[in-house]
UniProtKB/Swiss-Prot annotation:
Keyword Membrane among record annotations: no
Gene: mnmG
Stated name of the protein: tRNA uridine 5-carboxymethylaminomethyl modification enzyme MnmG
Keywords, sorted A to Z: Cytoplasm, FAD, Flavoprotein, NAD, tRNA processing
Organism: Xanthomonas axonopodis pv. citri (strain 306)
Cofactor field: FAD
Location(s) in or outside the cell: Cytoplasm
Chief subcellular location: cytoplasm
Length: 634
C-alpha cells in the first residue's frame, strides 16, 4: 500500500452526525480528509428519534446549511412529515421540524459523503491517538492507531465518538458494554483517553422501545398531519425534494401506566443507583416523568413513523430503561397500544464525556494541539448540536493544518456561537440542549436569515460552493431590489395608490405614507399588500418576501438590538494571551484567579460570562492587558 494511503491532513473519528459534518467541512475547506468509522453501513444513522429540527435545533440546522453542511439537504430528501413550530409567534422563535425516514436520511448522508472531493472513508475502529510529546512545546496529535494496528498520520484529528466511549447499556438490572444497541463500544480508546490530561465524567441518555405500527389502534389517537404548504429545511431545497408525506399521531399514558411504573421503580437502574451518569433534563425517561410529576394523570406521546417502507414506529415520550417485562406492560397500558408488539426494547446508555471547558472556541483541545472534539463527547445531546459542532471542528482542523487562524462565531452571530460559548465557559453537568431562550440576541439569530449571517463567511473559508453562492447572491439581490421598489412608492389620501390601498385592504391612508411603512402595521403583511393592483403581484420567492417583510416590520427592534451588540462588543473580543499569568494582576482575589485559571478564557467576553466574575475583576484585567500592550508597542 502506498505511503499516501496512511497520510492525511485531517482524520475524523466517527461517522455520526458530528463526524460526517466534520469530514465534509474539512474536505470542502481544502484538506485531504480521512473519515474512520467502525461500520460504513451506519454512516449518518439516526440512533434515536427519527427527526431533524425543532425549537433552537432547527436554527442550528439552518446555520449548518448556510455554511454548506449536509444535514438540511438530507432532511429535505428524507422528511416525511413537516411542521413549522411556533408558527403563530414572532420570527425569532419559529422553527422547522421534520419527521424523517431514517433509511432515506442515512442514504442521503452517505451519498453526500461519497460524492465529496478530498474525502476518503475507511472502515476501522480507532484504539489510540498518536501524540507527540515535545520537550519544550505543548503536546500535539500526529495520527491514530486502529484496532487492527494500522497507523494513519495527520496533524489534525477530530474525535466524534458519540456514546461509544466506554458505552454501557442498561435494561433493568441487565447491563453490558455497547456503543449503542447492536454496536460495540470504543473501550480501548476510552481507556487510552483517560490516560491523557482530560477531565472526563459520565453522562446518560436513553431511547424508547420501538413498536410494530400494525399492532396499534389509531382510531383512539389524534391525527397530527403535517403543514400545508410544506416548508423546506435547506436554503437550496424545494418542496419537490420531499418524499411522500404521512401523519404522526398523538396518544397518552394512563393512570394504569403510571401505577405499573411506580410498582417497578425498585427494578429501575435509574433509581437503584446502577446508573451514575446524569441524563438530559429536557428529554426525561417516562419513569422520571412519573416520579417528578406525580400529580399528572397522563403524559402525551407522539406516535412517529420510522419510515415509509417499514412498520416500526417511535413512541416519542416513553424513553425507558425499565426491565423488558415492565416495558411490555406499560406500553400495552397506553391508549391504542393494548395489542402493541415491541420490536426493540428501550434502554439507557452511559458514556464518557469531556469537560468542554478544556476546549478552545475552535473546539481544539487545550491539552493537545491539533486534536479537536465534537458532538456528544462535549456534553451535548441531539443530532443538530452534534452536527453543528462537527462542522466547526472540521473547518478548524483544516485551517490548523493550513496555518490559518481558527474561526468561531460570536454569540450575536449564530446559535453555534451560543452553543460553543456556553460549553467552553460554563461547562455542563448534564446533556446540553439548544433552545432559543439561550440566545440573548435571538431576534438577530432567526432561521430565515441564517444564510445572510453566515453564507458570506462560509464562502470566504471555502465551505460554500458556487451553486449555493449563486443562489444566495440572487436572493440577496432580489431582497434589495424589492425593498428599493417599495420604498420608492408613496400613498396619500388623495392619490391613486392611496385609494387602491383603501379599496383593496380597507385601510385608510390619513397622511403621506411610504409603502414600506404600511408593512409595519400589525394587520398588514407583504402578502396582503400585494393584493393592491399597483403593488402586486410582488416577488414569487417566499424567502425573498419573508426577508422584505421582517426587515421592515421589526426594523426598530433590530436596530435596538444591533446597538446593544455594538456596546457589548467594545471589549468582547479583546484577546487574553495563552498562558496568561492571572496571579500577576494586582487586586484579583484568589477566588477569581482560580475561576480564570480553570476556564482559561480566550477573550474578555468569555471571561465576563464565567459564573461569579465581577465587573471590578474585568476592569483590572482590561487595565493589565492594555498596559502590557503599550509596553510591547514601546
Amino acid at each position: 500500500m502506498s505511503d499516501s494511503f496512511y497520510r492525511y491532513d485531517v482524520i475524523v473519528i466517527g461517522g455520526g452526525h458530528a463526524g460526517t459534518e466534520a469530514a465534509l467541512a474539512s474536505a470542502r475547506a481544502g484538506a485531504r480528509t480521512l473519515l474512520l468509522t467502525h461500520n460504513i453501513e451506519t454512516v449518518g444513522a439516526m440512533s434515536c428519534n427519527p427527526a431533524i429540527g425543532g425549537i433552537g435545533k432547527g436554527h442550528l440546522v439552518k446555520e449548518i446549511d448556510a455554511l454548506g453542511g449536509a444535514m438540511a439537504r438530507a432532511a429535505d430528501l428524507a422528511g416525511i412529515q413537516w411542521r413549522t413550530l411556533n408558527a403563530s409567534k414572532g420570527p425569532a422563535v419559529r422553527a422547522t421540524r421534520c419527521q424523517a425516514d431514517r433509511n432515506l436520511y442515512r442514504t442521503a448522508i452517505r451519498c453526500i459523503v461519497e460524492a465529496q472531493p478530498n474525502l476518503t472513508v475507511f472502515q476501522a475502529a480507532v484504539d489510540d491517538l498518536i501524540i507527540h510529546h515535545g520537550a519544550s512545546e505543548a503536546d500535539s496529535v500526529r495520527g491514530v492507531i486502529t484496532q487492527t494496528g494500522l497507523r494513519f498520520q495527520a496533524p489534525s484529528v477530530v474525535l466524534t465518538a458519540g456514546t461509544f466511549l466506554a458505552g454501557k447499556i442498561h435494561v433493568g438490572q441487565t447491563q453490558y458494554a455497547a456503543g449503542r444497541m447492536g454496536d460495540p463500544p470504543a473501550t480501548t480508546l476510552a481507556a487510552r483517553l483517560r490516560e491523557r490530561p482530560f477531565a472526563i465524567d459520565r453522562l446518560k441518555t436513553g431511547t424508547p422501545p420501538r413498536i410494530d405500527g400494525r399492532t396499534l389502534d389509531y382510531g383512539v389517537m389524534a391525527e397530527q398531519p403535517g403543514d400545508d404548504p410544506l416548508p423546506v429545511m435547506s436554503f437550496m431545497g424545494q418542496v419537490s425534494d420531499h418524499p411522500r408525506q404521512v401523519s404522526c399521531w398523538i396518544t397518552q399514558t394512563t393512570e394504569q401506566t403510571h401505577e405499573i411504573i411506580r410498582n417497578a421503580l425498585h427494578r429501575s437502574p435509574l433509581y437503584s443507583g446502577q446508573i451514575e451518569g446524569i441524563g438530559p433534563r429536557y428529554c426525561p425517561s417516562i419513569e422520571d416523568k412519573v416520579v417528578r410529576f406525580a400529580e399528572k394523570t397522563s403524559h402525551q406521546i407522539f406516535v412517529e413513523p420510522e419510515g415509509l417502507e417499514v412498520a416500526e414506529i417511535y413512541p416519542n415520550g416513553i424513553s425507558t430503561s425499565l426491565p423488558f417485562d415492565v416495558q411490555l406492560a406499560l406500553v400495552r397500558s397506553i391508549h391504542g397500544f393494548a395489542n402493541a408488539h415491541i420490536t426493540r426494547p428501550g434502554y439507557a446508555i452511559e458514556y464518557d464525556f469531556f469537560d468542554p471547558r478544556g476546549l478552545k472556541a475552535s473546539l481544539e483541545t487545550k491539552a493537545v494541539g491539533g486534536l479537536f472534539f465534537a458532538g456528544q463527547i462535549n456534553g451535548t445531546t441531539g443530532y443538530e448540536e452534534a452536527a453543528a459542532q462537527g462542522l466547526l471542528a472540521g473547518l478548524n482542523a483544516a485551517r490548523h493544518v493550513q496555518g490559518l487562524p481558527a474561526w468561531s462565531p460570536r454569540r450575536d452571530e449564530a446559535y453555534l456561537g451560543v452553543l460553543v460559548d456556553d460549553l467552553i465557559t460554563h461547562g455542563t453537568t448534564e446533556p446540553y440542549r439548544m433552545f432559543t431562550s439561550r440566545a440573548e440576541y435571538r431576534l438577530q439569530l432567526r432561521e430565515d436569515n441564517a444564510d445572510a449571517r453566515l453564507t458570506g463567511v462560509g464562502r470566504a473559508m471555502g465551505l460554500v460552493d458556487d451553486a449555493r453562492w449563486a443562489r444566495f447572491a440572487a436572493k440577496q439581490e432580489a431582497v434589495q431590489r424589492e425593498t428599493a421598489r417599495l420604498s420608492a412608492l408613496w400613498a396619500t389620501p388623495g392619490n391613486a395608490l392611496g385609494r387602491e390601498v383603501a379599496d383593496a385592504l380597507g385601510v385608510t391612508v390619513s397622511r403621506e405614507t411610504n409603502v414600506l411603512d404600511l408593512i409595519k402595521r400589525p394587520e398588514l403583511t407583504y402578502a396582503t399588500l400585494m393584493r393592491v393592483p399597483t403593488l402586486g403581484p410582488g416577488v414569487d420567492d417566499a424567502q425573498v418576501a419573508e426577508q422584505v417583510e421582517i426587515s421592515v416590520k421589526y426594523a426598530g427592534y433590530l436596530d435596538r438590538q444591533r446597538d446593544d451588540i455594538a456596546r457589548q462588543q467594545r471589549h468582547e473580543t479583546t484577546p487574553i494571551p495563552d498562558g496568561f499569568d492571572y496571579a500577576s494582576v494586582r487586586g484579583l482575589s484568589i477566588e477569581v484567579q482560580q475561576k480564570l485559571e480553570r476556564v482559561r478564557p480566550q477573550h474578555i467576553g468569555q471571561a465576563q460570562r464565567i459564573p461569579g466574575m465581577t465587573p471590578a475583576a474585568i476592569s483590572l484585567l482590561l487595565v493589565h492587558l492594555e498596559r502590557a500592550r503599550r509596553s510591547q508597542v514601546a
